[in-house]
Amino acid sequence: MMVHDREDRIACEGVLLSTEAARSSQSKGRDSSEEEDYLRPCYQRDRDRILHCKSFRRLANKTQVFLAPEGDHYRTRLTHTLEVAQIARTIARALGLNEDLTEATALGHDLGHTPFGHCGERALSHAMALYRGIDPNSDEGRYLFRHNRQSVRLVECLEKDGRGLNLTWEVRDGILCHTGSQRAQTLEGRVVACADRIAYVCHDIDDAERAGLLTENDLPQGPRELLGGSSSERIDAMVRDICAVSAAAGDIRMSDDVWHAMMELRSFLFDSLYTKGDAKEEEPKATRLIELLFDHLVTHLDEVPEEYLKHDAGHPDVQVADYVSGMTDRYAVRVFEDLTVPRSWKGAMSHVR
């Protein structure tokens, strides 16, 4: 047995990876220079830093789709992240791409998500817009807070007591571009964007079926016939398609048929699950909770932990957004209750006659 150090790993990349893959030796680097690790190439170090950071642990108690589900088997933001990482690594390995970069990007892509899922994200944007005097329904107002930008902000300056994780440029680019119209500069980042869509479309259907909100027969017939009749079949079909089409194209792509089938399922979920129905009944409460927390804290900065006040002095809305977006669902409820629910007085009963 022998030790394979960082230089050995980098040499292996040159032999094993595709010519289009990102190589650790060619990274654009970090914002702050630092000594290289003896064993780990740069992207593996990034993956490990994300895995060990506080924001990653908090994902275990943040909503994916269902607010405060009672069952043990519904996805959270953490399980979603792990599923994205698994799908992305499978694609990256099949295409000869850099698995460390792919996994680091996947593990970090949702670090900046708010409590209560996308409704929390919308509520925070709405509250920030009102604070700034911007129409909350305008394009600017609707997107003041975006979880992908917040994920980058976390790893650049909020984690590690304000020092950030000092990740490589490629990982930060992939995190920023995993959603929206802007494509990542690396193929590995583009793989994560595809894996994210595959994961949430397939597992949100799975969770909805488990909750009794949907059945397989409710799904559009075309995608079922093309992709399969179960979550695992659909994931397998889309992963195989991406690998085959991308290998031929030299870029990360799906075939038109599979892409349209996936987007048809996504549209179905928006129409039947994300924007209405039993799964969304609690969203108005969660929205109001986030807005009330923001409105209170933005005028009571003394109640915001010091670590969130180290940046953007003079911009209390940003400081409060940093704090609130980092809360888990349970912690947000607890802070809200502390602000709004009277506490019991232990000595009260002793004075009753």
PLM regions with names:
Residues 1-77, 81, 85-91, 98-99, ...:
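Histidine-centered, transition-metal-coordinating active-site segments
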Residues 102-107, 193:
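Short alpha-helical catalytic segment bearing the HExxH-like zincin motif
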Residues 108-116, 199:
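Short active-site segment of divalent metal-dependent hydrolases/proteases
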Residues 119-125:
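Membrane-interfacial alpha-helical segments at the cytosolic side of multi-pass membrane proteins
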